[in-house]
Amino acid sequence: MNRRLRLLAVAAFLAAWPAAARPAPLAPRRYELDLAVDFKEERIAGSARITLENTGASALSEASFLLYRLLTVTAVRGSDGAPLAFSHNVVAFEDDPKRQANQVRVLLTPPLEPGASAVVEIAYGGYLAGYVETGALYIQDRVDEAFTILREDADAYPTVRAPSFESIRAAPPPEFDYVARINVPESHVVANGGELVERTVRDGRATYVYRNLRPAWRMDFAIARFRTLEAPGLRVFALPQDTAGAERVLRAAGACMALFRGWFGPLQDAPAFTIIEIPDGWGSQADVTSILQAAAAFRDPGQMHELYHEISHLWNVPARDASFCRWNEGLAAFLEALAAEKLDGTPTLDAQAEKVARRLRERAAEDPRLRTVPMIDYGKAGMTGDSYRTGMLMFYALYRLAGPEAFNAIVGGYYREHQARGGTTADFVRRSETIGGPGVAPLFQDWLFTTHWLDILASGAKVRELANRYRP
């Protein structure tokens, strides 16, 4: 059988794989991303060279990647440049039929042995149109000269996973290095939380080369006519109409980071930190060295608490739980309110906790699962959005029960002990119970491991008195 027929036969085999194939234990260890952005045609094109490691116990003969449904794969090659057999088909997520992606299935030849690594280079191009129709309202990603963002939320680059939210939640978060070359018109700036290695200009186009500062779990590249502001250890990319607000954001970020350092200790191996402005409604979020911050914080001083929320995530550790319930979002929601009270000088923490309690009671009427699914299982149940509120009240009660000094020792000590290798919910609970006193165990029993918290709220208990339930 000649080479062409052999490749066709293998491709036919790949096309016959079941759509619900589960992800193999493949971990991305390095990305080399090379993309050009064409505003006139509203498309991107380029390649992603991905180093994969088999973290499992048996050899693997295939890999599954996801791309946005309007991105087309033109070639797949190995480390030596030889073509690899592949198929790519637009498929629906098995647990969310509204969500569609281009699943790229690649045959690994020879099979990848346990502990071994291989390189897969995927050439692709096409369009982005977001995922708003799926209910993910913040994923409005598209190629537009006013603002463009390339991120994993919209599958703008190949991610190593299968089309199943259950399997994605169950997998540990990736950790990888990256080098990215993003080519844009000279008038535009590419913003990223990594180190800018170089910027070169040729024929009216600029190529920005970034590399990560710390092991990354995602890559975000925002493109606009940004203005850049810098201070020691901080960098802000602001949309051109918000330059004045960027000065305020820079000052507030510095004050907030100083506050958290005083509470939890310094960030370990702290690199320069980057804040990137994005339009409202596009989803503020943080990674290990940067924040995507919605424009509201740049335009309205009253919305600066959103920035405090994202900055608090810098003191998170990599979660090692399977199907993590994301209680760290509840911690961030609490620290957001606490920092706003301390930095703004107005006593708003108790009022914010009361507001969250009212909304939780409303949510329980809307979603009966809250009556039966404890927060520890929110990840398995696809309910992590509820961790923001349930977790906020849990940490509010813990803070009032243990007191500020013990609370800071819990959070800061957990960060210092587990930042390098990650930690689990069980690790955090053990530390909290050791430092926080005898009332912490029943508090976690009510708020984390059972749904008794709902009975407490339904009884009309005052939120300001929650901690009293757990005092000796």
Task: Give residue ranges: language-model regions.
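Juxtacatalytic substrate-recognition/specificity segment
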Residues: 180, 209, 226-327, 335
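Surface-exposed beta-strand/loop patches in extracellular or lumenal glycoproteins
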Residues: 51-71, 166-185, 426
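Extended, low-hydrophobicity, Ser/Thr/Pro/Gly-biased non-transmembrane segments
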Residues: 104, 119-220, 224
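Bacterial N-terminal signal peptides
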Residues: 8-16
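N-terminal, polar/Ser/Thr-rich
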Residues: 6, 19-45, 74, 172, ...
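A surface-exposed beta-strand-loop module
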Residues: 70-140
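Bacterial N-terminal signal peptides that target proteins for export
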Residues: 1-9
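Acidic/His/Gly-enriched intrinsically disordered linker/tail segments
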Residues: 325, 329-397, 401, 418-419, ...
